[in-house]
């Protein structure tokens, strides 16, 4: 009888990649539902387009690399990449944008590096940044939440807008972005930044309809809270660890609080930073990507804190209103260095 000894490591995680990805997709349901409620059917249509494109692009590359298509598509990683990109772009963005962004994310940012587990950068955020740099106007053309929108497109008009750029009555995106005050709307962070540049005071800005009676923007605070619910679910299921989201949110809140205390007339409040834009989505669903994040506990704390500082700096002093995507990619660059200096000590070996 021959006994074969498997090579190390001997510890084994019973959770398969497909189950982990499926849990993340399930955790995303509250956030997707909230975005659909406040911004319309476009969110769901973008997700469908992204999912189809992601699976198609993944299948093509796998076939070219002569790898098993069925087994790789069943790990749901391509679907998750498509979903994260789809919820990050405006719901009425032209159909070809989500197809282009998702295709770039899967083919260039993921498969070109060798596939799942080999990519150094978050594929969804690579796709997002490519679209943002290439098509800045379309990528910042968010609809106002239905509560302050003058016109809300129905399901068929949403489809027409995505595929033709016009509603049945001939309306376009410019018309749909008009709020109840008759002014074209933007996201809370975008509105804050552009209004400051226009010479408005923070006190004046906070009187705008998009901030009326809420902590961080009509609709957006509930969207962020919905993503937070999904993040708590992931923590409860032990799909992600607490280090990255907690260090990211605490650091972002600390930077925002200090900045707001020193310069309340030019910098956004902590609640606006925490409950606007892609804060909670980034904290629990993007930064926690096990492939592109730090792998040690101390490293995760540093990684999350670095991303928090970068988000605050970009939002406060950069040219883009949000900054989560850029912060994630910049933090991804530092992961090898962070992991090198936070390696746990190996006992029984002298320091070389």
From Swiss-Prot:
Keyword list, A-Z: Cell inner membrane, Cell membrane, Electron transport, Flavoprotein, FMN, Membrane, Phosphoprotein, Translocase, Transmembrane, Transmembrane helix, Transport
TM region positions: 20-40, 44-64, 78-109, 123-143, 214-234, 242-262, 267-287, 301-321, 322-342
Subcellular location: Cell inner membrane
Cofactor(s) it depends on: FMN
EC number: 7.-.-.-
Record's function text: Part of a membrane-bound complex that couples electron transfer with translocation of ions across the membrane. Required to maintain the reduced state of SoxR.
Record-linked NCBIfam families: PRK00816.1 (NF002011), rnfD (TIGR01946)
Assembly information from the UniProt record: The complex is composed of six subunits: RsxA, RsxB, RsxC, RsxD, RsxE and RsxG.
Designated name of the protein: Ion-translocating oxidoreductase complex subunit D
């Amino acid at each position: 009888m021959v006994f074969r000894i498997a090579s190390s490591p001997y510890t084994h995680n019973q959770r398969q990649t497909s189950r982990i990805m499926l849990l993340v997709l399930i955790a995303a349901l509250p956030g997707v539902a909230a975005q659909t409620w406040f911004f319309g059917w476009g969110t769901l249509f973008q997700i469908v387009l992204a999912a189809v494109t992601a699976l198609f692009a993944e299948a093509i590359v796998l076939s070219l690399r002569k790898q098993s298509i069925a087994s790789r598509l069943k790990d749901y990683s391509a679907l998750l990449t498509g979903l994260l990109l789809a919820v990050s772009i405006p719901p009425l963005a032209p159909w070809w944008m989500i197809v282009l962004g998702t295709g770039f994310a899967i083919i260039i940012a993921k498969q070109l590096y060798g596939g799942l587990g080999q990519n150094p950068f978050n594929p969804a955020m690579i796709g997002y940044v490519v679209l943002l740099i290439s098509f800045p106007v379309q990528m910042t053309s968010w609809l106002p939440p239905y509560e302050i929108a003058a016109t809300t497109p129905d399901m068929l008009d949403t489809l027409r807008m995505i595929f033709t750029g016009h509603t049945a009555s001939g309306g376009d995106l410019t018309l749909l972005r008009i709020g109840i005050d008759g002014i074209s709307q933007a996201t809370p962070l975008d509105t804050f930044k552009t209004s400051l540049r226009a010479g408005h005071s923070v006190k004046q800005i906070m009187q705008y309809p998009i901030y009326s009676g809420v902590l961080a923007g009509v609709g957006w605070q509930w969207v962020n809270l919905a993503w937070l619910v999904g993040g708590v679910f992931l923590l409860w299921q032990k799909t992600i660890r607490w280090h990255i989201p907690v260090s990211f949110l605490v650091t972002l809140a600390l930077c925002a609080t200090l900045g707001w205390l020193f310069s309340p007339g030019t910098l956004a409040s902590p609640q606006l930073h925490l409950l606007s834009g892609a804060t909670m989505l980034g904290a629990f669903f993007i930064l926690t990507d096990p492939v592109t994040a730090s792998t040690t506990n101390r490293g995760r704390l540093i990684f999350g804190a670095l991303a928090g500082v970068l988000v605050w700096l970009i939002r406060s002093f950069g040219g883009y209103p949000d900054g989560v995507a850029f912060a994630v990619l910049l933090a991804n660059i530092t992961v090898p260095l962070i992991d090198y200096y936070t390696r746990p000590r190996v006992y029984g070996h002298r320091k070389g």
